[in-house]
Amino acid sequence: ADNVCAEILKHHGECIAVQANVSDPAAVKMPFAQSISHFGSIDLLINNAGILLFKEITNIQDDEFDRIIDINFKSVFYALREASTKISDNGRVVTISSTVTRMMLPKYGAYAATKAAVEQLTRTFAREMGTRGITANIVSPGPVDTELFRVGKTIQDIERMSAMAALGRLGKVDDIAQVVLFLVSDEARWINGQNIAINGGII
């Protein structure tokens, strides 16, 4: 977060970094309060916190399941609930999901379930907030070359998943960021409640 802030400040923008436990409903209030205190208002929310649990269902322990539910699912609920009263009219919300919700990939069961859940939360939020001009959309990346993606995977796993895309490569962070940037712009004002796949052609 500090590196991102430094980059923003270098380009003459404004930035603050706030650390909070997104699985704690009380803690989720803090970034909203500090953002309003510093900037005066909140215009957009990106739900991007998440962890990966890469295990077959039979091997998932109760504490592991609880943790991924807390971080991937409950955090989005808490953030949307807080945003419902804090985000400005005509604001923008983007939730990061995953292409795996549309597939049957081994070892992705718990992760895919949390992402499917936040997709529905976001669609419902879009409906509930629409009269205020607030849009809420979902982006569903395919395999993107990040530290999170590589958790628990062998070289063979990574090569196999790279080959799934018609473009024949892993995604890059910027491939996703550019679509998110569009969705929070004025040009996307008539896009609402949608799920946009960004996966290089995984069908």
Regions found by a protein language model. Name each.
Residues 19-31, 62, 175:
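The beta1-alpha1 cofactor-binding region of Rossmann-like NAD(H)/NADP(H)-dependent oxidoreductases
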Residues 56-57, 61-69, 158-161:
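Substrate-binding pocket helix/loop in short-chain dehydrogenase/reductase
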Residues 60, 104-112, 124:
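Active-site loop-to-helix junction immediately N-terminal to the catalytic Tyr of the SDR YXXXK motif
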Residues 80, 114, 122:
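Active-site helix of classical SDR
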Residues 85-86, 127-131, 189:
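Alpha-helical segment proximal to the catalytic Tyr-Lys
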Residues 98:
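Residue(s) in the substrate-gating loop at a strand-loop-helix junction
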Residues 138, 160-191, 198-200:
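C-terminal helical subdomain
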